[in-house]
Amino acid sequence: MSHQLLSISPVDGRYNKVTSVLSDYFSEYALIRYRVRVEVEYFIALCELPLPQLAGVPKSAYEELRKLYTEFTIEDAQHVKEIESVTNHDVKAVEYLLKEKLEALGLNEYREFVHFGLTSQDINNTATPLLLEEALADVYLPALHELLDKIYSLAEQWEDVPMLAHTHGQPASPTRLGKEFKVFVERLERQIDLLQEIEPMAKFGGATGGFNAHHVAYPEIDWVEFGNNFVDSLGLVRAQYTTQIEHYDNLAATFDALKRINTILTDLARDMWTYISMEYFRQQVKKGEVGS
């Protein structure tokens, strides 16, 4: 039974009203959908080469194939979980689901090319950076820019409002309220720029990163070029030399950038709390709300 009151974390319990938009990116359902997306696009890319055995897949089938992730349902995700209860392997369960779907689309003779030559981390290490990159672009950065615009607007509005600055909790020298707000504008702008400079890296190269199975099966194909082009088509950057897994360095860099932005926002909140305690500002009262 699904209910917010049964959540084990306040993130998707008490605070669900503000975090629910992220479920399209970070829920297990979303992860499964992104895995399906990568598998489908990979299958289509193999058809586009084409691999000899896939030359018979009509281009008209691509739209229906893409509907497997654009119209992916909760019921589809639940079926993946049912398959996983037997396989005890989450990515293999996605592969089996897609084979069922291909059979339903009349493409049963091509089903064994789903996940051809790949290891699970080829899917995980593309689906994960992809969902994170799209969550940042669709949700996080628009919200952050909205906040930044508000802070900048207040800084402009209060540009010439004088106030007494403090250091070490004691009165120091005069300043302007607008200038104090522009401190946060500058800090946020710099960190947003740094965040957006981080490339979303993906790993895609088979069991140990060298496309070994691919080369054995089709030595005439430049699989490194294929992998680079495929990952680029997803809006990601392929790591050229890997083991079975992605390096995760850029993923760590992204989270570190988010941490720095959160630190700035914490500083902003603490300054506002201080200004309220000094009666420079007063909290807005909402009818019906109680407490501090």
Where are each of the predicted segments found?
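Intrinsically disordered or highly flexible coil/loop and linker segments, enriched in small
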Residues: 48-55, 107-108, 141, 157-160, ...
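Short, small-residue-rich loop/turn micro-motifs
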Residues: 155, 159, 234, 287
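Glycine-rich anion/phosphate-binding loop at the beta-strand->alpha-helix junction
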Residues: 191, 244-292
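A short, charged helix-loop
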Residues: 228-245
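Short small-residue beta-strand/loop micro-motif enriched in glycine and branched aliphatics
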Residues: 127, 239, 291-292
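A helix-coil-helix interface module used to build multimeric assemblies
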Residues: 2-211, 218, 222-229
